[in-house]
């Protein structure tokens, strides 16, 4: 049985032909499912748009970040308690600019959050924007009160220019801290402008996983092969697939959550284990289109549809939770309801062998 994506091939041919290895049966089990009420009010804020989640094993505290662009309330994060069945918010703090003020409406797009194991605080990403005004994505640090502590420099190819950099809504969706907190790892949701088309039903695409030091030095950057979109829209509406979360696993391995949405069909959520050890470092590769590079290998951990949850919503956040009583690791997922009454904030707990 094949255990990984084939080796060095032209990027364009990989996107059509390469297939990840199948998941091993029985390795993942759905053990918990809960939801939050739509437009729930907490401490003067409307809860929604929860696009990132993290768990601190040293304190037992959970963090979730809202992708509210300071349009309903100031950009913010929440703390929470979670026992696997009941998810209870315990606090909220605004995310602050270096001058101590809140972000103006539309100037920030929070996406992911990770507790810092080496300092009292957390890291978070903003997707930026490719609109009338170009706003670079960002990786920022904050203390537990939300005050800014640092801003990590980005490699040039992740910055916005008129012809290069992340596409709109396909920038830094995923963030994780690896190697004991010494390595800052991000994933773009989709390919950069210079890296070709986003996934379609005919082909996948190459996003980029970037490894940096805590001071911003680029340690490596790898091409990650996104799946094609799983179905065509029967209504002619939108159809997409992208990486919405990355999570440190073991050594040079990471879990990547691919979230696909097809208008008139629904969502598909697949989690892959990706291994960068044999991948080409592409930090100096200007464009991945037709580039002769070896992407990171990936193996399917679980297709959420196989676990038959009550629904599959717009899941964007992923974190390791506490060990379960039987010794298995818990993997917790959270959905971004886009503040829509037609969606739900869904929290799923998976048991992983």
PLM features: residue spans?
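Sequence/structural signature of beta-propeller domains
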Residues: 20-353
């Amino acid at each position: 049985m094949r255990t990984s994506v084939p080796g060095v091939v032209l990027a364009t041919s990989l996107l059509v032909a390469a297939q990840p290895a199948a998941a091993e049966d029985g390795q993942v089990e759905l053990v918990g499912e809960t939801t939050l009420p739509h437009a729930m009010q907490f401490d003067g804020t409307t809860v929604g748009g929860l696009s990132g989640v993290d768990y601190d094993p040293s304190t037992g505290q959970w963090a979730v970040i809202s992708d509210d662009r300071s349009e309903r309330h100031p950009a913010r994060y929440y703390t929470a308690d979670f026992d696997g069945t009941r998810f209870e918010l315990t606090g909220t703090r605004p995310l602050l600019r270096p001058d101590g003020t809140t972000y103006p409406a539309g100037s920030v797009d929070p996406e992911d959050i990770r507790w810092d194991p080496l300092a009292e605080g957390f890291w978070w990403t903003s997707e930026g924007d490719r609109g009338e005004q170009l706003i670079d994505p960002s990786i920022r640090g904050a203390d537990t009160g939300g005050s800014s502590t640092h801003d990590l420099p980005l490699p040039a190819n992740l910055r916005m220019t008129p012809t290069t950099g992340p596409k709109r809504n396909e920038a830094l969706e995923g963030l994780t801290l690896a190697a004991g907190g010494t390595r800052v790892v991000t994933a773009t949701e989709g390919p950069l402008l210079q890296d070709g088309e986003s996934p379609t039903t005919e082909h996948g695409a190459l996003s980029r996983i970037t490894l940096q030091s805590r001071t911003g030095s680029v340690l490596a950057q790898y091409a990650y092969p996104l799946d094609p979109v799983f179905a065509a829209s029967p209504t002619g509406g939108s159809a997409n697939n992208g990486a919405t979360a990355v999570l440190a696993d073991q050594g040079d391995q990471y879990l990547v959550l691919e979230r696909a949405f097809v208008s008139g069909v629904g969502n598909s959520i697949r989690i892959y284990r990706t291994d960068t050890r044999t991948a080409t470092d592409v930090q100096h590769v200007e464009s991945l289109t037709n580039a002769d590079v070896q992407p990171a290998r990936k193996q399917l951990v679980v297709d959420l549809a196989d676990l038959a949850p009550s629904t599959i919503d717009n899941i964007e956040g992923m974190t390791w939770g506490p060990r379960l009583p039987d010794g298995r690791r818990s993997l917790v997922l959270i959905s971004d309801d886009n503040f829509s009454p037609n969606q739900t904030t869904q929290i799923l707990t998976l048991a992983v062998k």
